[in-house]
A protein has these predicted regions:
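Short beta-strand/turn micro-motifs composed of small residues
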Residues: 10, 258, 338
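Conserved S-adenosyl-L-methionine
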Residues: 174-291, 307-308, 312-314
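C-terminal catalytic and target-recognition region of SAM-dependent MTase-like enzymes
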Residues: 287-289, 293-376
Length: 376
């Protein structure tokens, strides 16, 4: 097979960014939908998306798309799918997925039906009555929504947010894909001073450094499809070499600070693993008291929400103190994500713009202060 259809699930609110990334990578037929981005391409496009995407969650190869309201229709739809094109005779093919607003709502039953249909199809195509499943893992995923069944092959393995640089996070880490999106939404290109005053495990500064250097986030991790029989190993080598050639080597001003010394130590270790330690400075500091690190720049942060790390009232007091401290920081653009619906009130001024994003399952707003207006 030389041409495929792919689906890239995204955190809600990031679909447009992921679509733009795919287009910049030269990938064809990109279509943006709610919660995902679709594209067409060959194994090289698949590898490029896995290695280079910053805001997508994983890369799924679309195997089938059909309607089913009964288990028999589900079985027949899977049985008609050319699974032998992507799963070899000894391949291991576990099944997982989800159901929503459909006649078929039992995930375990749907898993069993899909597994049975896939086994029958592959057994007949390979002329065997029993499949050993001792070889490479080919993870099948299904989505049943409004009686529409979509069957996928996961080409990523661990989610794309797992860059490989964060072995251990702090108590409430920010997802790497969301951090990258937050940086992208500031239009940062490596020329401004970037400061995260609540850096935690360093995710925002690290993602900013990866963007500044144009360093592919998946350069040093492995992907499930690297072991697929129908993907030439040279594809991955070529994609990584091309990404390496496009990296920039400049001097960048990126600072991460936190009032917890343990977070600073963790951030330094993570930056080293990400290969960007030379681009970032980390230091202890109270965000509401420390001096501004430069006359102008971009502040990007994920302060405590009052849901996991602090009580809500304490978080609100923190927002007010931060607003007072930054009141005269006219040279700084400020980008702050929080689930607090009254953030602007506590911070002391209205945002120039705000955008709805999700941090895990938490619905948030990304407040963007891009002018020098000080009033509420």
């Amino acid at each position: 097979m030389s041409n495929f259809e792919f689906s890239v699930p995204c955190l809600f609110g990031l679909e447009g960014l992921a679509g733009d990334e795919l287009r910049r990578l030269g990938i064809e037929n990109v279509r943006v939908e709610n919660g995902r981005v679709l594209f067409s391409g060959d194994a090289r496009a698949m590898a490029k998306a896995n290695v280079c995407l910053r805001t997508g969650e994983r890369v799924l190869l679309t195997l089938a798309d059909f309607k089913a309201t009964t288990f028999e229709e589900l079985f027949q739809g899977v049985y008609r799918t050319n699974l032998e094109d992507v799963i070899p005779k000894d391949g291991t093919f576990p099944v997982k997925g989800h159901c929503l607003n459909s006649q078929l709502m039992s995930v375990p039953d749907c898993q069993a039906i899909i597994k049975k249909a896939a086994s029958k199809r592959l057994g007949e195509k390979y002329g065997v009555s029993w499949l050993p499943e001792t070889g490479t893992k080919y993870q099948l995923q299904f989505s049943i929504m409004n009686d529409r069944v979509q069957l996928f092959l996961d080409t990523s393995g661990p989610g794309l947010h797992k860059r490989g640089y964060r072995a251990v996070g702090n108590e409430a880490p920010l997802r790497e894909t969301l951090a990258a999106a937050m940086v992208q939404l500031t239009k940062y290109r490596g020329r401004d001073f970037v400061w995260d005053p609540f850096c935690g495990s360093g995710t925002i500064p690290i993602e900013a450094a990866l963007i500044a250097k144009n360093k592919a986030p998946g350069m040093y991790r492995r992907f499930a499809s690297e072991a697929f029989a129908w993907v030439e190993p040279s594809v991955w080598g070529d994609v990584r070499a091309e990404a390496k050639d496009k990296e920039f080597n400049g001097k960048y001003q990126i600072l991460g600070s936190d009032n917890d010394p343990k977070c600073i130590s963790l951030s330094i270790a993570n930056a080293r693993k990400a290969g960007v330690a030379d681009c970032i400075s980390f230091r202890d500091g109270d965000a509401t008291k420390m001096d501004l690190p430069a006359q102008s720049g971009i502040l990007i942060c994920n302060p405590p929400y009052g849901q996991r790390m602090m009580e809500q009232r304490s978080a609100q007091q923190l927002y007010a103190a931060l607003g007072r401290h930054l009141k005269f920081a006219d040279g700084w653009k400020k980008y702050i994500i929080t689930s607090e619906p009254e953030f602007e009130h506590y911070f002391g001024r209205r945002a120039t713009k705000k955008r709805k994003l999700y941090n895990g399952m938490i619905k948030c707003d990304y407040y963007m202060y891009t002018d020098n207006q000080r009033k509420k």
